[in-house]
Amino acid sequence: MEENINALDEINKGACMGMDAIKFIEEKVTGDEFKKSLEVQYNKYSDISNRINELYSKYDKEGTPHETNKMTKVMAMYGIEMRTTVDHSDSKIAELLLKGTNMGIIEGRKILNHKKVDKEVEKIMEEFISMQEDSVENLKKYL
């Protein structure tokens, strides 16, 4: 049961970080197609997070899924701000999002490879990883 909770927490943190990053950089994006693409990605992260919230109560009756802690969030946003001060092109933004998305894929794969989780938790994790892999392919267009 604990491994299911931990897996759901980690995936939810990744989804929340993805949503936070998109919200943070969306005003810097200049291309309309890229903006639409990020909106679609944001909605996918939101959907996964909502589904995790629904599933979470099955494993923890009193808790809610963990989100990214404030310090991690602030450091990530500060890093984005610093890296886009000189080069705030859509290409640079896509590069930063790609790096973050790859971190999410790696974390998700590690969890799947090393933890024993229930089938429904495994399914949502697979969907999250697949969604991020699709996002990587999409972001490559904007490099």
PLM regions with names:
Residues 3-11, 32-50, 90-96, 120-131:
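Alpha-helical scaffold segments that form or flank carboxylate-/histidine-based iron centers
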Residues 26, 43-46, 69-74:
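Short N-terminal helix-initiation segments at or just after the protein's N-terminus
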Residues 93, 100-143:
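Preference for long, well-ordered alpha-helical segments
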Residues 50, 54-95, 99-103:
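Carboxylate-rich helix-loop segments that flank metal/cofactor sites and access channels
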Residues 11, 18, 25, 48, ...:
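Amphipathic alpha-helices that form helix-helix packing interfaces
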Residues 29-32, 52-55, 59, 115, ...:
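Hydrophobic stripe of amphipathic alpha-helices that form coiled-coil interfaces
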Residues 26, 56-59, 63, 112, ...:
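Leucine-rich amphipathic alpha-helices with coiled-coil/heptad-repeat character
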Residues 1-30, 92-116:
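Alpha-helical bundle segments that constitute or directly flank the non-heme di-iron/ferroxidase center
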